[in-house]
């Protein structure tokens, strides 16, 4: 019975909404019949934003201004009314009086609905209650809203609806807009910092025949004109390294990459990656760059080198910790992989600690599994985890003193991997052997393994200088800078399952 009542209530609400929407259409058609079609207006000259007026009231009081935005509130009181208009930067109140705007215009204004986009021209003043406002001389309907906005933000609490109708979410929730303003600042700050360090921004192909540079399944497509199967890139790496070979000593790219993987709070199949490569340095140089870059971005975007995410506070002002993967596992799991003699012993350890592994896994793979299980969650403060096993690092230069490990680091904060960096492998013969090992892994069932890229090997054979490289996930960086709980909160239009028609 309760469910039936809920269905009846929901149906009644939908019927009421449909009636209100029809009233809006009727109002539009009446305006159009009277030669006042708002959709025929092509431009409107705006002189100020709302916050500009509020911040500069003393110099603007009594001056004529023009604003435009969405009407979010209206109160009609006989011969005079108040409304709030929301623009890019905030809201401002307008006082609309019949004697000032004229009888016909005032009659039209009284029929306008919350959600309509208005242009208001008038003089700046302060009401008796002290609110900075505009005394309207002209009110122009610039666009008619034919749908009903939620009355308050609690009218759009369904997260699925918020992501699908981000345009409504942005209107109703100022915090959402602020998040994406900060996202833009993050990206512009990265560009400003790297440009100042002598890096050059470049663009490389998104459609590729061989999707390499990361461990991930690619999306596949078909190029009709060439009758060829292509893939969407999963990384920016291999083309940027080709540019290092070509003599571009410092390059970076900020671009979309695509990985055919699952959805969760930290993963979206298309996301924004920044990769950079610098000739004549190594992974230690990349650590220094990462520290300086993160501090710079935090200061530019948040005004502080102290970040708060959920219950954690991270201090970027102190030197970032540096620890090897072996030492990290020893510290948090009390297991010293330097004392593990071979793959068989590593697998036995995994079984004893109930860590699942695959038959193809070797000692280095299992070290990484222990790291993921026992260490990652503890890495709250900024930490560089260095010297990964060679098995999980096919594009990285070996450590000269121990060929079982490579010159690689992952940057962690809040228990998350935030960046991945290498001393880049530039030995073409070694790289070919790594590709061959990856091909074997693919044949054994690893769908994320890399394939041999002959053109990239040819580029290495031309000669690539010692190089340091790093990749940052922009979306996670924005999550951290805005204290956003999910990656979808920092993507304007995240990937969503299609609604069945």
What are these regions (language model features)?
Residues 1-501:
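Class II aminoacyl-tRNA synthetase catalytic cores and aaRS-like
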